[in-house]
A protein has these predicted regions:
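Polybasic low-complexity intrinsically disordered regions
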Residues: 41-57, 65-71, 75, 79, ...
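Helix-centered, glycine/charged polyanion-binding patches within enzymatic domains
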Residues: 2-7, 194-267, 275
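Hydrophobic alpha-helical segments, principally membrane-spanning helices and signal/leader peptides
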Residues: 5, 37, 54, 77, ...
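Acidic, contiguous segments within the catalytic cores of piggyBac-derived transposases
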Residues: 16, 23-35, 233, 242-258, ...
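Sequence-level motif detector for i,i+2 pairs with an aromatic at +2
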Residues: 3, 23, 113-115, 253
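Basic, low-complexity segments
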Residues: 1-45
Length: 314
């Protein structure tokens, strides 16, 4: 089959969105300036916080977007304030490190309405370990630490609807219920790979009245009648010899957009976390998701192709 050829129909708009990703005013906007310092009355005794949660979130987002250390991010933002002649100061790097353990970072967009297809997958973010070249030449060391980033993506808009970070030993199916409960929007169907073919995942989808598009594992048997979606998926390869027809009729192949989301994460922000405390790593990951959603909202390519499908954008 010939390689697909795509034609972007909104190239001027998308090109401008790509350029704006490098603009500091795109990430450091008027909303952040106005709410930089904490103005709310403290609810408990002790020294009040000087910087708002939005200020800490902004520092973490800029750190991820420009791939800076906390100290470098502090110097970078302070220099921007100085050049703009804005009477603000960046939080000290130690303050950001401490506040990251408790800050609540919101990554959800104001989009509303029904989601036709929600696609789910996970990827690993490295905390400690050598690079691939060293592993290739000398083998891997014993100590390699990873975290798992779980994402649920709207296949139409590419927006990340739900996100969670877990330890490496947490399976995809174990993280699924907590992930899907993050949204109360109506979802028509949810697609995931065979790792999610467990009763735990199917029960959660049935509870939320979501059609399950999960291919059964090899040698899978039928479940009780209430699992009709899964039983149809089990029956199809037995009748046709493969899952190809089931994937085509259910539009399961849109799940590849979850792989696109993982690719965008690694290409735009790197595949590692730098904060050492686990709660801080959660905040760093959510800042990454917030930045990705902001890029998505700013502009995505619209395309046409002879064979149909979506352009693998970043």
């Amino acid at each position: 089959m010939a390689k697909q050829k795509f034609k972007i129909t909104n190239w001027p708009t998308y090109n401008k969105a790509l350029i704006n990703r490098g603009s500091i005013t795109f990430w450091l906007d008027d909303e952040a300036f106005q709410a930089w310092y904490e103005s709310a009355t403290p609810s408990s005794r002790g020294r009040p916080q000087r910087y708002s949660d939005l200020a800490i979130t902004t520092v973490l987002v800029i750190k991820r977007v420009f791939r800076l250390t906390l100290r470098a991010a502090q110097g970078f933002i302070d220099s921007i304030f100085s050049l703009m002649n804005v009477p603000l100061r960046c939080p000290d790097y130690s303050c950001v490190s401490r506040r990251a353990k408790s800050v609540n970072i919101s990554f959800k967009t104001p989009t509303r309405g029904e989601i036709a297809h929600l696609v789910i997958d996970s990827t690993g973010l490295k905390v400690f370990g050598e690079g691939e070249w060293k592993v290739k030449k000398h083998g891997q060391e014993r100590r390699r630490i990873w975290r798992k980033l779980h994402l649920a993506v709207d296949s139409k808009t590419h927006e990340i609807i739900c996100a969670d970070l877990s330890l490496n030993n947490v399976t995809d199916s174990e993280a699924f219920p907590g992930l899907i409960r993050q949204t109360h929007r109506k979802i028509r169907s949810a697609a995931a790979d065979g790792a999610y073919d467990t009763r735990l995942c199917h029960d959660e989808l049935r509870r939320k009245k979501i059609s399950a598009l999960i291919p059964p594992r090899k040698g899978a048997g039928y479940w009780p009648g209430e699992y009709a979606d899964r039983n149809r998926a089990v029956a199809n390869p037995r009748m046709t010899g493969s899952n190809a027809r089931w994937k085509w009729t259910t539009d399961y192949n849109r799940r590849s957009i979850a792989e696109t989301a993982m690719y965008r994460v690694k290409q735009l922000f790197g595949g590692s976390l730098t904060l050492r405390d686990y709660d801080g790593q959660v905040a760093e990951a959510m800042a990454l998701v917030r930045a990705l959603n902001k890029m998505t909202k700013a502009g995505m390519p619209e395309n046409t192709t002879r064979y149909g499908g979506d352009l693998p954008e970043i």
